[in-house]
Amino acid sequence: MSDIWDDEEVRETPSEITRVKRDHSQAGYLAGVTKAKDESLQEGFNAGYPIGGQLGLSIGRIFGYLQGKGLVEEEKQARKELSSTRIFDRQYWTTDAAPTYEGVHPLVKQWENKIDVMKRE
């Protein structure tokens, strides 16, 4: 057993050097991928937050009106038609998660129009 304070030169074998290089390369790759994913997620969040917030607010107003008026069947229908599955259907969004429509989401617009009619009756 050698003393840790010995002046003996530590020699690494080629396999140890290869392993260390591989480990450092993998760690660098993983750090790069993680950073890129984090940046991409943040950009997506920043872009989608205002759209999602507006959708939630609009849909909440629709549900609130129907509940407030005691329109149980209409509310059930609205919840079905304005479900997240339908709101986020592929026909309304590009592969980059941008809306394919301009202005108000078409399903929300339909319900806003229905409520406008109800208010006039």
From Swiss-Prot:
Pfam families, from UniProt? Answer: Yae1_N (PF09811)
Q: Where in the cell is it found?
A: Cytoplasm; Nucleus
Cytoplasm as a keyword? yes
Segment deca-GX3 motif: which positions? Answer: 28-68
Biological process annotations from GO: protein maturation
Keywords (alphabetical) are: Cytoplasm, Nucleus
Record-annotated membrane-spanning stretches = none
| Stated role | The complex LTO1:YAE1 may function as a target specific adapter that probably recruits apo-RPLI1 to the cytosolic iron-sulfur protein assembly (CIA) complex machinery. May be required for biogenesis of the large ribosomal subunit and initiation of translation.
Q: Into which family does the record put it?
A: Belongs to the YAE1 family.
Q: How does it assemble?
A: May form a complex with LTO1.
Q: What is this protein called?
A: Protein YAE1
Gene name in the database record: YAE1
